[in-house]
Amino acid sequence: MSLIKKKNKDIRIIPLGGVGEIAKNMYIVEVDDEMFMLDAGLMFPEDEMLGIDIVIPDISYVLENKEKLKGIFLTHGHEHAIGAVSYVLEQLDAPVYGSKLTIALIKENMKARNIDKKVRYYTVNNDSIMRFKNVNISFFNTTHSIPDSLGVCIHTSYGAIVYTGEFKFDQSLHGHYAPDIKRMAEIGEEGVFVLISDSTEAEKPGYNTPENVIEHHMYDAFAKVRGRLIVSCYASNFIRIQQVLNIASKLNRKVSFLGRSLESSFNIARKMGYFDIPKDLLIPITEVDNYPKNEVIIIATGMQGEPVEALSQMAQHKHKIMNIEEGDSVFLAITASANMEVIIANTLNELVRAGAHIIPNNKKIHASSHGCMEELKMMINIMKPEYFIPVQGEFKMQIAHAKLAAEAGVAPEKIFLVEKGDVINYNGKDMILNEKVNSGNILIDGIGIGDVGNIVLRDRHLLAEDGIFIAVVTLDPKNRRIAAGPEIQSRGFVYVRESEDLLREAEEKVREIVEAGLQEKRIEWSEIKQNMRDQISKLLFESTKRRPMIIPVISEI
């Protein structure tokens, strides 16, 4: 059945996130005068983003054109896809489309952030068709590590614009995790104009190990454990959590969760029937010590680096609930991102030092939730797109995916490597990338949205690395003299007792600068402060090779 509704003219595709990074998915598709947002995800901060809680895409372009926005279409319930939805809805009105579980998780996010706003939610599935003025939109089931994942298909007169979301192919999975390859093939036969596809594992050869094989090998590994077993995984990896529950039941072990991030999403999914949990399998973490060590499994969960951080604290005996003991076994069911590799290596060393046995994480007992090379080529061959846009990955992953598309038969000149804010235009004849819109990161610090910029981050780095140096002086401007001070206060810069000579020298330098400023015909406070910053910075760098943040404080009587 053809879902083409009318003859279209102009198409624009704009990534606002999810390119050059593995997170923060957000893609804008405009067909004539209608705009559609595909996913609205967040990113957890990188190490250098000191004090930042989360990062979301800059949606200033969407806000400038909000009357055109017809809806937010979500592929699955991970934070990379839905984490920014509540922030978007604070700034504009738009209906939200997603699977039953995804919508439930969005509602929970809105509730957690105390956003009391009437939102139009539409629950969609593999059979849903949403009709708009210029296009029709349908969906197809995909496989990911969370149930009810979907791909989105925007039907235009030029063919379908297909957004895969995050996916892999696994014939061993059924029910809420099963892909609808038949529906994908139908879309491919109807004609795919543009394929926008997940690039996360585009550099990994072959296929993922099927999940039924993973569970079999996990069972064999866990069955050999004689003491307490701790499994570390992301709270969002529902497949892995279900597998641990299955194995625990077979081994007659109780299961307890360690980590707050799992509680809300797990409880929602459990109530909706997405988890199969044998009776009396779960116990509170506070009751673990009531059971023999060989009768429990602890699942340490969290978002991003939280599970690894928890293990590190446990290994150093700094965790407030549980610590690693001699004879514990630990399994990390985590795919290490580039910025996590060093942290994980250090944590493994800490665990071994604390007496833990590490169950090796290899292809037999762990699989990615993203398609590897052959799975990505399979999607391309099923869809047979005219144009191809690799997304959801670092730039090197996008390039690797572009090469796979060329191998699968897509003309190289019809493959677009895009960055945030790039605009791909199609006017009925040519597809060109010749425009850019505002894009970037919005940093969330506490309840502040976008009020932390690069200057603030620079200052935080300065404070973290070199400390702070405060010079306080009280002036009597009427009599042009120093009434009190200078007084020097330092934090995180030098140990005061061992640097008394340097601090006295700094006090004298401040006195010289201030007294010179007081002799001027017109006293310029800003100029005096800047001279203090410049000259004190030079003095301190010559003595210590460090540049603390210098704050001059001048008060008057």
From Swiss-Prot:
Pfam families cross-referenced by the UniProt entry: Lactamase_B, RMMBL, RNase_J_b_CASP, RNase_J_C
Subcellular location: Cytoplasm
Protein residues bound to substrate: 366-370
A biological process term (GO) from this entry: rRNA processing
Cofactor note: Binds up to 2 Zn(2+) ions per subunit. It is not clear if Zn(2+) or Mg(2+) is physiologically important.
One of the record's GO cellular component terms: cytoplasm
Assembly information from the UniProt record: Homodimer, may be a subunit of the RNA degradosome.
NCBIfam families on file: MG423
Name this protein carries in UniProt: Ribonuclease J 2
Lineage, uppermost ranks: Bacteria, Bacillati, Bacillota, Bacilli, Bacillales
Gene this chain is encoded by: rnj2
